[in-house]
C-alpha cells in the first residue's frame, strides 16, 4: 500500500525513531482547514501537541477515543464560534521520520470535540480536548437524534438504507442536499452480495435486503438504526482509521488464521512484556441462537458447538457449557447459524486474553493479527493473536498496550441441530426428516435416495 516508504517505515520501527503526531482540523466536506503537530517549530503558530493518548476497542458503534493536550496556544485554537466549535471534526495521524528525512503519517481516526478544557496561567496557555469517535455524530452524543420513530421496510437494500441515513441534512434531518451528517461515503463489504437466506416461511431473499420491517424507538437516533440494520447481517459496523463508516462481515471473521500479520513480536525487541489472564466463568462451548417464529409456528434456529479436541475449552475437556441467545429479528436458519458460530468463537476465547506492552507502532489496527515468538519456550513456538484494542501515548515517549485474544484458541465450530446431533447426520423426528444442506439427495418418481445407514432413527452419511 505504501510501497518503498512502507518498507522503510517497518524497518524504522526497529530503531530509536522520532515520533510524529498531527491534528488536522477539517472542513464540513472533509478537506483540511489547518493542521497542528507535535513540533515546537510549527510553521502556522507556536502552538503544538504536548501530550495525550489514543484508545481503540473492537466493538460495534464507537471504537476510538483520544485525550490530547495542546500547549502554547494562540487565539486560533480557542473553543469558540468560528474557531474550534461544536461539531468540529479533527483527524489524528501518527507516524515517524523515515531515514531519508520524509515525514510518514498513518491516519488513526476522525474525531469530534466532546469535553474541551482551557487553562490560563502566567506564561501558560493550554487546552485539553477529549476527542470522541465520529460515531458520536450519529448516536445522540453530539448529534443524530431522530424526530420520531424511523422505519425501514422489509425488502429494502440494507446498504442503501445506511447510506441514505448518513446523507440526511444535519440541520433539519431531511433528505435535502447541502449539509449531510457524514460527507464521506460509507464502505460496504461485497461479502453478502451474492448470498441469500431462506426465511421461516420458505421464501428466499438476498442477504443485503431487509428480511423484516424495522422500526426504531420514538427517542431513537441514527446510530441505533444503523446497528439494527447491521444486526440483520450479523455484521461489524464502525468508523475505520480513515474516518469512513465501514461494514464488515462477521461470518468470514471466523477463520482469523488466514489474515495477514501486522507484526511478529519477539521478547526483548519491540515486545517488553506479556500478561495472560484466564476467566473460565466466561467461557461457553455450546451456543444456541433462537430467532423469530412465523405464522406457522416455525422458528429460525442455529446452534454451534466446540467439539475441536485441539481446543482447551472443547466439550470433551470441560463438559457442556451452553449459552442460549434470543435474536427475535432473525428470520432464517442461515443467519441464526452464522451468528451462533461467530458467538461460539467469541465465548471460547473470552476466558483467555493476552496484554502486550510494546514500543509504539502506528499501523496496529483492531480485528487484525499479530504474532509472538515465545523464545522462552522449547522450540520457540509462534502464537497468533487477534487484536481487540490498544492504548498508545501520542507523545514521543511511552509504551503501547495491545489487548488481544489467541487465534490458536479459536475452535473449529461444529454446526448442530437443536437436539445436539451434529449436522453430518440425518435426523428422523416424527414425520420430519432433517437433511443437512451440505449433502445433496436425489428424488426420482417419488423416491428419496440418501447414501448412508440407519441406526436408532439416525441416518449417518456415507460421505458426509
Where are these regions (language model features)?
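Surface-exposed cap/loop segments at beta↔alpha junctions
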Residues: 1-20, 56-65, 72-185, 414
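Short coil/turn motif common to extracellular beta-sandwich-like domains
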Residues: 428-434
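Acidic, small/polar-enriched beta strand-loop surface segments
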Residues: 1-41, 224-227, 231-388, 393-395, ...
